[in-house]
Amino acid sequence: MKTLIRPLVVIFAVLTVVTGMAYPAVMTAFGQAVFPAQANGSLIERDGRAVGSALIGQPFDAPRYFWGRLSATAPMPYNAAGSGGSNLGPLNPSLAEQVKARIAALRDAGTDLSKPVPVDLVTASASGLDPDITPAAAAYQIERVAKARKLTADAVARLVAANTTGRQFGVLGEPRVNVLKLNLALDAAQGGH
């Protein structure tokens, strides 16, 4: 029996050190050395203070800001600890009611509903925390943001274009606009913080 227990204890100890301590330490050091911004959460700073992450959606509801995708992390919106979608299928009546309510909220905010509403403005993403919207969703909001900020639509459209990221490696994903970065660029363009 002793001959079986000793090798098991040694293997357990070695694997604990290798997989529980050495490997995580090496990967952490590698991440900090090669990808420091990403390893620390892709934080966006303004005046030396973190204002958010490029990877997590932020709540914006003032007319002067672009609005992101809706959060599915109720009751605390944009709570990364509660990440997850609504799990409502496309034929679920609850989803249809939620979309109708969101379209009504856009109308109440003074958005021109004569154009088709981009789907990402009235639905949540699978994670419920998506930081990006489509260029179509950004274009849909240009008039409202320009009016609220007393800017020309062309000036706001140029900021949208400057903050649009194309497909990764030219083929992966879709073009997207990071809402936090765009809103910070709007503030900076007007001399605000």
Swiss-Prot record:
MF terms in GO: ATP binding; P-type potassium transmembrane transporter activity
Lineage: superkingdom: Bacteria
Keyword field: ATP-binding, Cell inner membrane, Cell membrane, Ion transport, Membrane, Nucleotide-binding, Potassium, Potassium transport, Transmembrane, Transmembrane helix, Transport
Subcellular location as annotated: Cell inner membrane
InterPro entries, sorted: KdpC
Main location: membrane
GO cellular component assignments: plasma membrane
Listed transmembrane segments: 7-27
Bilayer topology annotation: Single-pass membrane protein
UniProt subunit comment: The system is composed of three essential subunits: KdpA, KdpB and KdpC.
Similarity comment: family membership: Belongs to the KdpC family.
Primary role: Part of the high-affinity ATP-driven potassium transport (or Kdp) system, which catalyzes the hydrolysis of ATP coupled with the electrogenic transport of potassium into the cytoplasm. This subunit acts as a catalytic chaperone that increases the ATP-binding affinity of the ATP-hydrolyzing subunit KdpB by the formation of a transient KdpB/KdpC/ATP ternary complex.
Cited PANTHER family: POTASSIUM-TRANSPORTING ATPASE C CHAIN, POTASSIUM-TRANSPORTING ATPASE KDPC SUBUNIT
Protein name from the UniProt record: Potassium-transporting ATPase KdpC subunit
Gene: kdpC
